[in-house]
Every structure is written in C-alpha cells, then in structure tokens.
Amino acid sequence: VHVTSRILTTAFAAGLLATGVAACGSSDDSGSSTGSASSGGGSSVTATLNGAGSTFAAPIYQQVGADLKDKGLTINYQGVGSGAGVSQFAAGTVDFAGSDPALADEDKAAIKKGEAVQIPFALGAITASYNLSGVKSGLKLDGETLANIYLGKVKSWDDAAIKAQNPDVQLPSTKITVVHRSDSSGTTKGFTQFLANYSPAWKSGPGVDKDIKWPTGTGAKGNDGVAAAVKQTDGAIGYVEQAYALQNGFTFADVKNKAGKYVAPTLESTSAAADGIEVPADLGVSTIDAPGDGAYPIVSQTFAITYKDGCKAGLDKNKVTGLKTFFNYLINDGQDTIKKLSYAPIPDSLKAKDQQAVDAMQCNGAAIGS
C-alpha cells in the first residue's frame, strides 16, 4: 500500500490499509458487475478505480475507499496535487481526477477522450496555520496582511499590521517563515484568489493560479508537506486544509471575511460559505470569499472528475459502473464520512444538481445501472 498523505490520524490510518492507495495507471482489471442496487445509488460492481489529484481531498478518498471495499470497489488514489491529477486524467492514465478548483477552459480542452463531468462533493477550510511559541489559536489576520506576509513585506510577528489587529496579544519579535506549496495545487489557487481579492499588489504580481512564482518563502509538496514544514519551524506560517491542521494540533488564524468579521475555520463557518451558492451549468462552483457574517472566507470546494460517457472514452462497462457507484456514494452516504474527517458536506441545493449529473453518466449512450 502506497500511502499518499504522510501525516495521518489513527482514525483513518486503519482505513488506509483497506483502501489500497497505490501509484498506478488506468487499469482494465475491472471485474464484473452484479447489477444489484448499492447504497447511495448506482449498481453493485467489482472494479478497480485509479485516480490522482488533490491532496486537500486525499483523506476523503482514502476513507471512502475503505468504506466501499466491501461493495467490491478498490480505489487507488495518488495525492499528487490538483494540477498533476487533471493532467494525468487528460492523458488517460487514471480513471478519475480530484481537483479543488473547477476545470478551467484549457483543462476541458486538454481532455480529448470525451466530455468530462465534475462533481463538487465537499467543502474544506484553507487555514492560515502558524507555529508561534506562546501564541494560541485565534490570532486575527485580514487578507491584506496575509498577502503582505506572503509578499515578504511583513517579516516579523510583532509587525504593526499584526499588532493593530491583535492589541491584546503579546506578540514575539520572531521572524516569520513563509511556507507555500511547491507543486501545482488547487489549495494554492484558492489561497491566492483570496489574497488577490484584498491586495492589488498580489493581484498584479504573483497572481492567481495553481502554481505561481512565489516572492518569498520555502516550498513543500502537498498539504502534508506544508504541514510538516510548519510543524518543524517556530515562527512559520502555511496554508493547509483544516483536516491536516487538526491532525497536527496546529494553531490557526481567525481570518477577516467579506462582511468584516474575523471568523475561525470550523465546520459551521465552512458550511456557511456555501449558503446561497450560485451553481453554474457545469457545476464549477467557487466558495472563496463568500458573503455572510458567519462564513469563513478561505473555503475551497473539491471535485471528483471523470467522463460523462466513460465507455466512449475507452473504459469498460464494469469500470464505468464502478465510477457511477463511487460518485453516488460521495454525494450521498459518503457525506457522513466527509463530516467525520472535518470537511463540510455540500448543501442540498448543490447535491440535487450533483445527483442529476451522476444519474446522467452513460456507457455508449445508454444509462448505467437502470
């Protein structure tokens, strides 16, 4: 078993042993379909599904793989970052991709084997986690200050900009060590989008993307790599998905939202970011900098991506049936797993549209599991 996330809680480490997380290409060893109904919709099937992408969502894929093992599905998932995962899917080396940002037009154009379907199935807070001796969780930071930290303009923890937002906190003069992602990352795209919203210098400089030229700091691969670097360095700050922050017992900032409120990343404030969310036809939603007093402002959605008609894309029927069962589980019974792992479930309004898209998955133009 090749485990893609190095920093794991005992709670889902056991699940990993049953999941079969492995580094491998798309497999034709997909077994056989029984045609009986399975939990969350679709058909019961014996299949091996190979995926790659988001480290943000890797704990979900790992645990869901364990959940579905007794239903005949083996899910092999590589947490290589959203950009690499989408590239592998476009190249046809995996059956599905995990990505935190929605597919961009250039991503869709690169997927030559068939039209893709992207299913947003969970929300997660991107924390501004710090390792600062003597300072508890809840340090207040706004978007401009975070941008200036990552621009290298705010260099110490007792900088006036941080002091002004935290007058009652005894801040040390410790040097700030900036940690960022070194790989192509959906977490990076979400974080840089937030910074650009509050910093013209960021917007016109480093900009918004899955992989940018960083003005300062140390790069690390994956959410787990950033978490490890922050944990090892007093004075460090890094942006990591909340599940990784909680696993490591990190302290993290209350970040100022669009309504002017400093909000801690919690399940409730993450869910609030999806209140009244606009859902485009391709389901490419975004929850960064959402309105609402209670919304945490740096919330990323995560997508599972495959083909609308997998058989036409070259996958066999059993594998395509397995993908539909897997996607159905993610948006139905899997939502309980998502909550247990400290991610927020999707709202009912989005789930209904997800269900329509999953129900429309086909094999050579025919419905699956009907």
Regions found by a protein language model. Name each.
Residues T19-A23:
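C-terminal motif of bacterial Sec signal peptides marking the signal peptidase cleavage site
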Residues P167-F194:
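Non-catalytic, conformational "gating/processing" segments within enzyme and secreted inhibitor domains
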